[in-house]
């Protein structure tokens, strides 16, 4: 769990903002959301495969050469 030291005469809002930023950098929120519900291993594999397919389709679309018709 990330922690911060509140500086002297520091407003609460700024300290809270620094704490949230450190939590975001540490990946606490994404980890909690990922572990909020149990996900079966088959669902994890299915999600990973779908992400890989999406990634390859995106790379192929990026590298595709658009040819103009000459007629």
From Swiss-Prot:
Database matches in Pfam families: Ribosomal_S21
Q: Which gene encodes it?
A: rpsU
Keyword match Ribonucleoprotein:
yes
Q: What domain of life is recorded for the organism?
A: Bacteria
Signal peptide from the UniProt entry: none
- What are the GO MF terms of this UniProt record? structural constituent of ribosome
GO biological process assignments = translation
Q: Record keywords: Ribosomal protein included?
A: yes
Would you identify the family this protein belongs to, as annotated?
Belongs to the bacterial ribosomal protein bS21 family.
Q: Which organism is it from?
A: Ruthia magnifica subsp. Calyptogena magnifica
Recorded hits in Gene3D superfamilies, A to Z, give: Ribosomal protein S8
Q: Which InterPro entries match?
A: Ribosomal_bS21, Ribosomal_bS21_sf
Its recorded name reads Small ribosomal subunit protein bS21
One GO cellular-component annotation of the UniProt record comes to: ribosome
UniProt keywords (A-Z) are: Ribonucleoprotein, Ribosomal protein
């Amino acid at each position: 769990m990330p922690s911060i030291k509140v500086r002297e005469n520091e407003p609460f809002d700024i300290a809270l903002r620094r704490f949230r930023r450190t939590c975001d950098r540490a990946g606490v929120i994404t980890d909690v959301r990922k572990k909020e519900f149990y996900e079966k291993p088959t669902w994890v594999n299915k999600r990973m495969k779908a992400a890989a397919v999406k990634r390859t389709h995106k790379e192929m679309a990026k590298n595709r050469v658009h040819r103009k018709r000459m007629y």
